Each structure stands twice: as C-alpha cells, then as structure tokens.
Amino acid sequence: MKRIAVLTSGGDAPGMNAAIRAVVRKAISEGMEVYGIYDGYAGMVAGEIYPLDATSVGDIISRGGTFLHSARYPEFAQVEGQLKGIEQLKKHGIEGVVVIGGDGSYHGAMRLTEHGFPAVGVPGTIDNDIVGTDFTIGFDTAVTTAMDAIDKIRDTSSSHRRTFVIEVMGRNAGDIALWAGIASGADEIIVPEEGFKIEEVVESIKNGYAKGKKHNIIVLAEGVMSADEFAEKLKEAGDMSDLRVTELGHIQRGGSPTARDRVLASRMGAHAVKLLKEGIGGVAVGIRNEQMVESPILGTAEEGALFSLTAEGKIVVNNPHKADLDLADLNRSINI
C-alpha cells in the first residue's frame, strides 16, 4: 500500500489532531504518501482531498478540535453516497483510509472495506462510549475540563451554601459524569446506567447540610435528562429553593488535549497505519489493559466484532458500552 488518506467524522474531540499527526508521520516513515480528507465523508464525496506532509501536521499536537474539520453526512449510509466517495478515492489513487470518529464513522469505514478500500477506525469521541476499547480519544480531556469547571462552581456554591445541578456531556453514557464527579468530590452522580429515586437524592442533600456541609454538588449525565428537568423534580420532591443549574455544554469538546489523550491518540494513529500497511481493513483499533488491540467492525459477538447485522439488515452493537458502576459505588462510599 503506497497511498492512504485520513479523515475525521462526527463530533470533534480533543486529541484528534494528535491522531492525524501520528497517521501522517508514521505513514511517511513507512514510505507511504498521505492525503487528508477535509469535512469527513461529505468532503470525500465532494473531492476535498489534498496531500499532507510532515510540515502539514507540525505544531498541531497541542491543538483541540480537528484541522481536517468534521461533518455529519448521513447520506454515506446509502450505497449511492459510498460509490461517490469511492470514485473520489480512486481518482486520487488512494488505497486505504484511516477514519477517526465514533460508531457512526465506523459504519462508513466498514462500507469502504466492503467496496475494496481497506479502512481502519480510530475511536475519537469525548463520550467514551465506543465498544472495543477501554478509552477513546478526547475522553480524558473532557473529564479534566468538566472537573476544572465543577471545582470552580464548588467555590461559589460554598460561599452561598447552595445546591448545584451540573449537567455534563456523554450522550447515553455516564463515563464523563462518573469520572469528573469523583475527581471533583461531587455529592451525587446521576448516570443513565443506574436508576435513582429523587426522594433519596433530596434526603441526601438535606442530611449533608444537617452535617454542616457548605455546598451540595450533583453531577448529572445528559443521557438521564436535562439539568433543568432534574432541578424541577428536586423542587417538587422537597424544599429546594436555593438551587442552581449549570450546563457545561460544548466547552467539554474543546481545549488543548491532556498528555494522556495526546499519547493515546499517537499510539492509535500509528497502529492504524501499521494495520493498513499489512492490508488489514474493516477493523477498529482500541486500547485494553494499556495495550493496542484491534477488533472487527462487523461480524458476530463470538468473533469479537463490534457490530452485527440483523436479518432485516439493521446494524446493532454486539456488546453495548456501559459505564463502570463500581465507580458509582466508590463515590457513595467516600461521600458520607
């Protein structure tokens, strides 16, 4: 394989630039040419494909976001969209593609491989909800950003003896809430993977103030409900007059990546190039027990594949991601 391309797709995540840098420089060191596909699959179809060299990716390791830009392009799920993209790949002499993004991006990588263009997925999302890996690129930075914000909110919360409901990102996963909540000493952490009783939350808040606590911090994963809705439920269940709500929002997707995300992204990007050089496609890289691994994107659970097809042709996750609820137990045991 002499010429490959790299793209980023879906929501951006800190560390994507570090992964792109690793792909480009590892490929060059292996004697390969590298092209950047701008604006994800939409850019592939539009022919936004340009050569990259070592200088192109200089000084981007510390930058958040993705300098290749990203876009959601649902049309690539259709054969017509895939064939248009493949036509552009052929036009530019590209033989393999590294796709950095979430599970939707993986589906595109799988389709490219089926059409004869080996593609390797690299997990880039702050949500940490991709199967086949312990951690995704951007998660550590998002947790650190959320933790820093929660620390600041605690300062003002203590000054006024207030309760704060702080909503963090994560889509349907509670990983950011759990990690940021524990790291910031949150009093309550509410995640989609675990049920809760609003009356028990209210009782815990009141008990905390009775013990002399100066604040009460509730970290809420967005996959449960909005912070405003949760606050209304608290007010309905008890006297919560001095209650404030904060939605951290897209600040969690930006910023310079942490050292861990930079190293993780570099390892994953380089490993993806190694696989393409060996002619391997239709797989996604990951990290398990601090070791690089790869898993088939499509197949059976027994084969270790991430996704499978139903009889109706629908793509389903073989082993859906769930946040580690041992962390929830830990938080309860140390917040007394």
From Swiss-Prot:
Pfam families: PFK. It comes from Streptococcus sanguinis (strain SK36). The gene is pfkA. This is ATP-dependent 6-phosphofructokinase. ATP binds at residues 11, 72-73, 102-105. It comes from the Bacteria. Mg(2+) binds at residue 103. Catalyzes the phosphorylation of D-fructose 6-phosphate to fructose 1,6-bisphosphate by ATP, the first committing step of glycolysis. One of its GO terms (cellular component) is 6-phosphofructokinase complex. One of its GO terms (biological process) is fructose 6-phosphate metabolic process. Its cofactor is Mg(2+).
